[in-house]
């Protein structure tokens, strides 16, 4: 769970997998379920070959159709109970302690952030910073995966703040440098 690479194409997934990502999260925003499935088949196969967890972002039906290992749901997404009924890994997003505590009642892990400002999600909440991340990590009993503005220069800070791992979008192609920084912090 140390390095989640959020990807929207097979090439980025391949680079992330070869660089040491431990989870590939298939993230296609505003795309119909059948297209998520069709475009995700090759990435699912890549994950199986590399022994990596394959998680689908936001779309429970696509995850089930792809035989995914898990689903990550945002705060406004539905389907958490269905994910659990099917025995899949469930990640839920949270931007604060109260939200994380509520999510942790059902989730296998909590995605916390944004830690720092990020251009990958223009409508993101205000950054929680390392102190907010630390508070959130202490407040829940499930692993916390930090997200938002994370790259090789600051990933280790998230681990030192208590996160079990980090999730990246822009830095997914830099997985090798991220993994080296994370391994050094562990």
Per-segment meaning from a language model:
Residues 108-116:
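Non-cysteine beta-strand/loop elements that form the S-adenosyl-L-methionine
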Residues 1-109, 131, 135-144, 151-163, ...:
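Conserved N-terminal beta1-alpha1 strand-loop-helix module at the mouth
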Residues 121-134:
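Substrate-recognition "cap/lid" segment bordering the active-site pocket of phosphatases
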């Amino acid at each position: 769970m140390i390095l989640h690479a959020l990807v929207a194409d097979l090439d980025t997934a391949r680079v992330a997998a070869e660089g040491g990502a431990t989870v590939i999260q298939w993230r296609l925003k505003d795309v119909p379920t059948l297209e998520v499935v069709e475009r995700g088949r090759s990435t699912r196969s890549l994950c199986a070959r590399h022994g990596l967890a394959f998680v689908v972002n936001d779309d429970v039906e696509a995850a089930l159709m792809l035989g995914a290992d898990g689903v990550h749901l945002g705060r406004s997404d539905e389907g958490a109970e269905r994910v659990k009924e099917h025995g899949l890994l469930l990640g839920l997003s949270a931007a604060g302690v109260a939200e994380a505590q509520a999510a942790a009642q059902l989730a296998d892990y909590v995605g916390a952030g944004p830690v720092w400002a990020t251009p990958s999600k223009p409508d993101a909440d205000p950054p929680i910073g390392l102190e907010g991340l630390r508070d959130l990590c202490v407040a829940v009993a499930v692993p916390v995966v930090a997200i938002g503005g994370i790259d090789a220069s600051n990933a280790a800070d998230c681990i030192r703040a208590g996160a079990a791992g980090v999730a990246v979008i822009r830095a997914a192609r830099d997985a090798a440098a991220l993994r080296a920084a994370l391994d050094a912090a562990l």
